[in-house]
Amino acid sequence: MPPPSDIVKVAIEWPGAYPKLMEIDQKKPLSAIIKEVCDGWSLANHEYFALQHADSSNFYITEKNRNEIKNGTILRLTTSPAQNAQQLHERIQSSSMDAKLEALKDLASLSRDVTFAQEFINLDGISLLTQMVESGTERYQKLQKIMKPCFGDMLSFTLTAFVELMDHGIVSWDTFSVAFIKKIASFVNKSAIDISILQRSLAILESMVLNSHDLYQKVAQEITIGQLIPHLQGTDQEIQTYTIAVINALFLKAPDERRQEMANILAQKQLRYIILTHVIRAQRAINNEMAHQLYVLQVLTFNLLEDRMMTKMDPQDQAQRDIIFELRRIAFDAESEPNNSSGSMEKRKSMYTRDYKKLGFINHVNPAMDFTQTPPGMLALDNMLYFAKHHQDAYIRIVLENSSREDKHECPFGRSSIELTKMLCEILKVGELPSETCNDFHPMFFTHDRSFEEFFCICIQLLNKTWKEMRATSEDFNKVMQVVKEQVMRALTTKPSSLDQFKSKLQNLSYTEILKIRQSERMNQEDFQSRPILELKEKIQPEILELIKQQRLNRLVEGTCFRKLNARRRQDKFWYCRLSPNHKVLHYGDLEESPQGEVPHDSLQDKLPVADIKAVVTGKDCPHMKEKGALKQNKEVLELAFSILYDSNCQLNFIAPDKHEYCIWTDGLNALLGKDMMSDLTRNDLDTLLSMEIKLRLLDLENIQIPDAPPPIPKEPSNYDFVYDCN
């Protein structure tokens, strides 16, 4: 007879004694269990003791997390969190450098546990650490020359403990002094400092900026972009990542009036070129966290365009009207417009109206009215002027080429530019905040200081080319825009490394090629809608679904590394989960770093029997998505969240690294529970595999027309005299 579900069998260690095998009754209070363990080893004052995991996490067992204890778990009897916090609080103030160093090392490790962190913070431990950072450097300045390694380790452990303690969100960031901020900033500003100290200092500065408006002001006074740039020119990708994260944080929290100023500083300091040279084109792979920070920087840079995108043109503003006059002048090189009053006003108005019509504006009389719609507002006019000035030959050619065509066949440059600018803003999501999980950056946008304008210049020439290839008329304007959008989107998915490469990709995506792609997709769709094919699909679909199911389960057996997210930032903290080969148990556990390849089952400390799983929930239904916090409200995170519910009020919470892994895991878990696999990935895989299988089966019928209906059954004969009776 199996043991009751409330009983778990564990091993408990105590230094200097043989481990004990015990059965823990989860219905009993934790204090009663600890007393029982202490009595077994004849230890008095059981209230001074606690249980913690014996694995590398060393997390304390509490009433909140005790349900995570599984059969076979190894626990350790140790001093209680309150006692441990009190002892460490005293030890880190020791006059002995060795004792202080050892205490800070222990503190850095234990601070990851929220139970211990709460007790240490209650002793005003955060203030003690900040005082050590502020004054400790001066106090031990004389010792640095003879004890430099010891001093570096001490400061590193102090900052690590501080980061871990603050990461729990117990203490407000607004409580820190200017002296502390200056000290942290000084570590970042030093040219030669220990890597671990630099990394933690950058992490602290980023958190200060993101979590407090007041601290943003103070950090911005202490740290300049020029002081951060040398860290990007190094070879340590983690330092580069944290440096860009600080720049992004300063950018994100800057007041509107300061963002453009900051962008100008970034341009002066050649930040883009340095990132392109030392990060994007460095001889090493870009990890996910770096890709995310580059994506954030890309989004924040493009969001600088939002102000112009949402600004309507003022038809009465002479400076703005002069831009339109400049477009006309460059295009038609107006021959010494009479400065005197010789030409009549009516003649000049007529000439302007004719030229504005050639420029493709909708309102020929007052083209300023074309820019009153937002988006794209004044951004469209900015793009047109940039194209006219920096690609003058192409601009003049397009305008004159179209002005010489028949009215109905001309590609209106003005209208096209306005609609194209609006479309490009939609593609690049200008004005939207960066996602917490996305890492979709485009290297080509880091190759030019005016990348959006250059992007526009390439696309407006593409639009003109596509217009000619389609032999379009004014009625076809929307169709042309749809084709151009498809061309741009298909070229962007290839992630070109430069704007020139993007241009060459577009050359290969002519209107004829787009038609071929569309026709191929349409033919495939039509071919597979006939009745015989649909019947064949229905027959082989169960085989394909079984194949997909096996692939999903095989991927779960291989396992996936999940990233632990919190309200502060995306951390380099990982945990791994994989299914046992017999599909009966999920093995999972924390990791110190991202693994290279599969993690063996033996190294994963925790187990969850598949038979115990009650349900799999996703999105807002997940327990960890119902918690309060800025991160939890993010739409992208919600779309990647899922949870396994088991036992009573127990859950295993996941946030997938990307949409693909989310689909793999939700499909696989549903398959284990005997439920349908409902993800988009399953639908796509099913369509692809069904299509391939049907094509393979129909190879022998090539060029043979398959009828839509079976042949008719012939009429019965008039008599059956032809029947031969063997008897």
From Swiss-Prot:
It comes from the Eukaryota. Keywords: Acetylation, Apoptosis, Cell membrane, Cytoplasm, Membrane, Phagocytosis, Phosphoprotein, SH3-binding. The keyword Membrane applies. GO terms for biological process: actin cytoskeleton organization; actin filament-based process; apoptotic process; cell motility; phagocytosis; phagocytosis, engulfment; Rac protein signal transduction; regulation of postsynapse assembly. The modification N6-acetyllysine is found at residues 100, 105. The modification Phosphoserine is found at residue 344. Phosphorylated by HCK. One of its GO terms (molecular function) is SH3 domain binding. A motif (SH3-binding) lies at residues 707-714. It is found in: Cytoplasm; Cell membrane. Gene3D superfamilies: 6.10.250.810, Leucine-rich Repeat Variant, Pleckstrin-homology domain (PH domain)/Phosphotyrosine-binding domain (PTB), SH3 Domains. The modification Phosphotyrosine is found at residues 18, 216, 395, 511, 720. Its main location: cytoplasm. The keyword Protein biosynthesis does not apply. Residues 555-676 form the PH domain. One of its GO terms (cellular component) is postsynapse. Signal peptide: none annotated. Residues 319-492 form the ELMO domain. Interacts directly with the SH3-domain of DOCK1 via its SH3-binding site. Probably forms a heterotrimeric complex with DOCK1 and RAC1. Interacts with PLEKHG6. Interacts with HCK (via SH3 domain). Interacts with ADGRB1. Interacts with ADGRB3. Interacts with DOCK5. Involved in cytoskeletal rearrangements required for phagocytosis of apoptotic cells and cell motility. Acts in association with DOCK1 and CRK. Was initially proposed to be required in complex with DOCK1 to activate Rac Rho small GTPases. May enhance the guanine nucleotide exchange factor (GEF) activity of DOCK1. This is Engulfment and cell motility protein 1. It comes from Mus musculus. The gene is Elmo1.
